[in-house]
């Protein structure tokens, strides 16, 4: 990201969104916020993203990098600056003390304790503008965090790989690999920014997955998600999911909402279980997003990506809408959200 000057507030917010994505997965339990500081001539004088827990928020990181050039400048940030004391002082204090001229943000802070920053800034004489690229931010880097704030439960993304005829394995049960290497690398990148990976005991017993996030060279990513195994069956002590490469939690239930309550301290959960677990979560309305890696192969046979979802006729079909479609190597990645 070597942009030195912007021509519009929207362009500056686009850069702030990039900074937000850059820190996603490293800021838990704080939201992954990005900030850019622009002087009156459109020159970027400071930028940054939220630091890990205990570190500074994005606005303060950007102010630190801007130094005295922040005076009279425009601060563009993906979320309303906070107005409370936590492990760090309120961001509004730093903005007022830096004598910035204007603060532009995308989405309001829904936290009743931390919110109210916009009003505080206005009262101090700063110009404040809200809602810039709000939909892009809310559906992008802050999607999972905002869901957690609204519901108190983690955001669940069901990820699966399938052939173009909807099969998750061949008739003999083999599935390595349906998706391409490029798709698998993309998945590992997503694992590295998730808080937890969720599978059932059936997947562990059948496939013995490690459920780790890895880099392109095969080494472990610096940050590993919590591995969560759901079900009442025992798994062998030598199972790879129990190795010391990451932490593992066992949740002995078949009820999706019990699982989510047990993970209520998490924000972003990847459901990678097989058709039984996926079906249970879909029936419970516990999936917020679907990521389907579709490979250009035909398998036929009985092994579908999902079991019964409680639909007996076409009228009662579970209807989703496409969020995005992109090419990942030879595969397609379909992203869908609930209507």
Swiss-Prot record:
One of its GO terms (biological process) is riboflavin biosynthetic process. It catalyses: 2,5-diamino-6-hydroxy-4-(5-phosphoribosylamino)-pyrimidine + H2O + H(+) = 5-amino-6-(5-phospho-D-ribosylamino)uracil + NH4(+); 5-amino-6-(5-phospho-D-ribitylamino)uracil + NADP(+) = 5-amino-6-(5-phospho-D-ribosylamino)uracil + NADPH + H(+). One of its GO terms (molecular function) is 5-amino-6-(5-phosphoribosylamino)uracil reductase activity. Zn(2+) binds at residues 57, 82, 91. InterPro entries: APOBEC/CMP_deaminase_Zn-bd (IPR016192), CMP_dCMP_dom (IPR002125), Cytidine_deaminase-like (IPR016193), DHFR-like_dom_sf (IPR024072), Eubact_RibD (IPR004794), RibDG_C (IPR002734), Riboflavin_Biosynth_HTPR (IPR050765). The keyword Oxidoreductase applies. Residues 1-152 are annotated as: Deaminase. Its EC number is 3.5.4.26, 1.1.1.193. Its cofactor is Zn(2+). Pfam families: dCMP_cyt_deam_1, RibD_C. The keyword Zinc applies. Converts 2,5-diamino-6-(ribosylamino)-4(3h)-pyrimidinone 5'-phosphate into 5-amino-6-(ribosylamino)-2,4(1h,3h)-pyrimidinedione 5'-phosphate. This is Riboflavin biosynthesis protein RibD. It comes from Mycobacterium tuberculosis (strain ATCC 25618 / H37Rv).
């Amino acid at each position: 990201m070597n942009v030195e000057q912007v021509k519009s507030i929207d362009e500056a917010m686009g850069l702030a969104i990039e900074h937000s994505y850059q820190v996603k997965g490293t800021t838990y339990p704080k939201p992954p916020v990005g900030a850019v500081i622009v002087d009156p001539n459109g020159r970027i004088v400071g930028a940054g993203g939220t630091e890990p827990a205990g570190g500074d928020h994005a606005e303060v990181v950007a102010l630190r990098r801007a130094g005295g050039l922040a005076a009279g400048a425009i601060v563009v940030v993906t979320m309303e600056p906070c107005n409370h004391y936590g492990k760090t002082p309120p961001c509004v204090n730093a903005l007022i003390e830096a004598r910035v001229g204007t603060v532009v943000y995308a989405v309001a802070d829904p936290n009743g304790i931390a919110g109210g920053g916009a009003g505080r800034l206005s009262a101090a004489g700063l110009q404040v503008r809200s809602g810039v690229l709000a939909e892009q931010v809310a559906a992008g880097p802050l999607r999972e965090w905002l869901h957690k704030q609204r519901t108190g439960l983690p955001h669940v993304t069901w990820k699966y790989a399938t052939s173009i005829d909807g099969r998750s394995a061949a008739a003999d049960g083999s599935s390595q690999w349906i998706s391409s290497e490029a798709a698998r690398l993309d998945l590992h990148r997503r694992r590295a920014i998730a808080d937890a990976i969720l599978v059932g005991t059936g997947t562990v017993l059948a496939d013995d997955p490690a459920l780790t996030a890895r880099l392109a060279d095969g080494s472990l990513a610096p940050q590993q998600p919590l591995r969560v195994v759901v079900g009442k069956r025992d798994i062998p002590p030598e199972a790879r999911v129990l190795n010391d490469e990451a932490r593992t939690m066992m949740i002995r239930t078949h009820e999706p909402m019990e699982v989510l309550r047990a993970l209520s301290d998490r924000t972003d959960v990847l459901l990678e279980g097989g058709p039984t677990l996926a079906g249970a979560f879909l029936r419970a309305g516990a999936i917020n997003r679907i990521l389907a890696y579709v490979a250009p192969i035909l398998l036929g046979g009985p092994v579908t990506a999902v079991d019964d979802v409680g639909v007996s006729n076409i009228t009662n079909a579970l209807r989703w809408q496409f969020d995005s479609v992109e090419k990942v190597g030879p595969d397609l990645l379909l992203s869908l959200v609930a209507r």
